[in-house]
Curated annotation (Swiss-Prot):
Family, per entry: Belongs to the universal ribosomal protein uS8 family.
Protein name: Small ribosomal subunit protein uS8c
Highest taxon, organism lineage: Eukaryota
Organism: Psilotum nudum (Whisk fern)
Localization of this protein: Plastid, Chloroplast
Encoding gene per record: rps8
Assembly, per entry: Part of the 30S ribosomal subunit.
Length: 132
């Protein structure tokens, strides 16, 4: 039995956005840490910190909202490549998300990066998720 921590993280963030929660706790793994760093770097979240409880560790993400109505910065967060169906792309065929307004997070041979970085470095890889 395998467990998809990336899909869990995406579901937790989407649910927290719908509840307009300020903070959300996601499982800490190497891949989720890289995804969280990209979300912070691209301005989708305010901050994050690592919390350890006994044998498990988590990231506490501080989500970003706009204005008085608290519109979430993350409009959509979708898992693309799944354990049951892996999706790969070379750098020329990586699609621009909403004409460059969103990002694709890609796992390449040089690590996890955004679609823009992958195109600049001319690297293809597994398309993990889309965020806008």
């Amino acid at each position: 039995m395998s467990h998809d921590t990336i899909a869990d993280m995406i579901s937790l963030v989407r649910n927290a956005n719908m509840r307009k929660a300020v903070k959300v706790r996601v499982p800490a793994t190497g891949i989720t840490q890289n995804i969280v760093k990209i979300l912070l770097q691209e301005g989708f979240i305010k901050d994050y910190m690592k919390q350890e409880k006994r044998t498990r560790s988590f990231f506490i993400l501080t989500l970003k909202y706009q204005g008085r109505v608290r519109k979430p910065h993350i409009t959509a967060f979708k898992r693309i490549s799944k354990p049951s169906l892996r999706i790969y792309s070379n750098y020329q065929k990586i699609t621009r998300i909403l004409g460059g307004m969103g990002i694709a997070i890609i796992s390449t041979s040089s690590g996890i990066m955004t679609d823009r970085e992958a195109r600049q470095k001319r690297l293809g890889g597994e398309i993990i998720c889309h965020v806008w």
